[in-house]
Curated annotation (Swiss-Prot):
The winged helix domain is involved in binding to DNA in the preinitiation complex. Signal peptide: none annotated. GO terms for biological process: regulation of DNA-templated transcription; transcription initiation at RNA polymerase II promoter. It comes from Methanococcoides burtonii (strain DSM 6242 / NBRC 107633 / OCM 468 / ACE-M). Transcription factor that plays a role in the activation of archaeal genes transcribed by RNA polymerase. Facilitates transcription initiation by enhancing TATA-box recognition by TATA-box-binding protein (Tbp), and transcription factor B (Tfb) and RNA polymerase recruitment. Not absolutely required for transcription in vitro, but particularly important in cases where Tbp or Tfb function is not optimal. It dynamically alters the nucleic acid-binding properties of RNA polymerases by stabilizing the initiation complex and destabilizing elongation complexes. PROSITE patterns: HTH_TFE_IIE (PS51344). Monomer. Interaction with RNA polymerase subunits RpoF and RpoE is necessary for Tfe stimulatory transcription activity. Able to interact with Tbp and RNA polymerase in the absence of DNA promoter. Interacts both with the preinitiation and elongation complexes. Belongs to the TFE family. This is Transcription factor E. One of its GO terms (molecular function) is DNA binding.
Length: 165
């Protein structure tokens, strides 16, 4: 099984299922188990266990098997974690993040910004000129924003992601 203490895996799972979901995974019994057994073993509320299992199933990180009780006709859902494919999920997530950072980086590089000194708004030059460089919220004169620090942070983050390939 994949180590849920690996910071990259843990960060991905945290984003996907939250802290209670991670707690559930860490305390989940081995093999096929019911959601009630998972809730009892992990101490996580049953509705959160079910929500987490459905999210993990949608992302192919958990497998569900239905079993019908022959006497009552009731269905029992048996769950088992399958984190064997998490590496491909991490690669997809990295690509998504890289794409979004590149879009933001290009936007920051290609634009000139004006901001309200009170922090009300941040506009590109075109929008700022439409309101005559006056903040529409508070009426203060908007100031040119040097976004070079933001551009550098975005570039550094993109470089770090590329270096981790």
């Amino acid at each position: 099984m994949t180590d849920s203490n690996d910071p990259v895996v843990r960060g991905y799972l945290l984003q996907l299922i939250g802290e209670e979901g991670i707690e559930m995974i860490e305390n989940m019994p081995e093999g096929e188990v019911t959601d009630e057994q998972i809730a009892e073993a992990s101490g996580v509320m049953l509705n959160i266990v079910r929500r987490t299992l459905f999210i993990m199933n949608e992302n192919n990180l958990a497998v569900c098997r239905r079993e019908r009780d022959s006497s009552s006709g009731w269905l029992t859902y048996l769950w088992q974690l399958d984190l064997s494919d998490i590496e491909s999920h991490l690669v997809k997530e990295k690509k998504r993040i890289t794409k979004n950072l590149e879009i933001r980086y290009n936007f920051e590089v290609d634009s000139v910004f004006y901001t309200c000194p009170e922090g009300c708004v941040r506009f590109e030059f075109k929008e700022a000129s439409k309101c005559e460089f006056m903040c529409p919220a508070c009426g203060e004169d908007m100031m040119f924003e040097d976004n070079s620090v933001m551009v550098k942070k975005l570039r550094d983050r993109l470089d770090a992601l590329e270096a981790s390939s």
